[in-house]
UniProtKB/Swiss-Prot annotation:
Catalyzed reactions: ATP-dependent cleavage of peptide bonds with broad specificity
Its job: Protease subunit of a proteasome-like degradation complex believed to be a general protein degrading machinery.
The organism's place on the tree of life at top rank: Bacteria
EC number: 3.4.25.2
The organism of origin for this protein: Paraburkholderia phytofirmans (strain DSM 17436 / LMG 22146 / PsJN)
Protein name (database record): ATP-dependent protease subunit HslV
Catalytic residues as annotated in Swiss-Prot or TrEMBL: T7
Length: 178
């Protein structure tokens, strides 16, 4: 069976504000299965934002594990991310999961990959998924050349990615921490 895939998740941090947004399209092969999926969420009592790209079931499995790590480490985002990445890399079953996460709290944004990488994005901007490169390029240009808020930059970046990537639509969910 083909894997569910294709999405765009983008995060922008500017000053003491961060926004994380994603589109709503779920694709199975060349068929759009759902247009209004919610791939960006608030967890840990609303203090942490998380967005996911990749296999839907894989992403939900990782999201559950990440939430457990956050609880275990009292909301320490970096520690929870590193512990999840360690498990992801060493556990035989977890290694087969195909997904990526972007996580953000009031002070930190991290990208967590299936290779066991935990990346702190340069310049406070990162994006993942099939439309990630388009969204990241747009967000970087907007951040460098405008005074738009992180939420506005995320919204416009997702709009541009949705215009260019066939696996990304214009149904957006955007969460912020200010």
């Amino acid at each position: 069976m083909e894997q569910f895939h294709g999405t765009t998740i983008v995060s922008v941090r500017r000053g003491d504000k961060v926004a994380l947004g994603g589109d709503g399209q779920v694709t199975l092969g060349n068929i759009v299965m759902k247009g209004g999926a919610k791939k960006v969420r608030r967890i840990y009592n609303g203090k942490v934002l998380v967005g996911f790209a990749g296999g839907t079931a894989d992403a939900f499995s990782l999201l559950d594990r990440f939430e457990a790590k956050l609880e275990k480490h009292q909301g320490n985002l970096t520690r929870a991310a590193v512990e999840l990445a360690k498990d992801w890399r060493t556990d035989r079953m977890l290694r087969r999961l195909e997904a990526m996460l972007i996580t953000a709290d009031a002070t930190t944004t991290l990208v967590i990959t299936g290779n066991g990488d935990v990346l702190d994005p340069e310049g406070g901007i990162c994006a993942i998924g099939s439309g990630g490169a388009y969204a990241q390029a747009a967000a970087t240009a907007l951040a460098h050349n405008t005074e738009l808020s992180p939420r506005e930059i995320v919204e416009k970046s997702l709009e541009i990615a949705g215009d260019m990537c066939i696996y990304t639509n214009h149904n957006r969910v955007i969460e912020t921490i200010e």
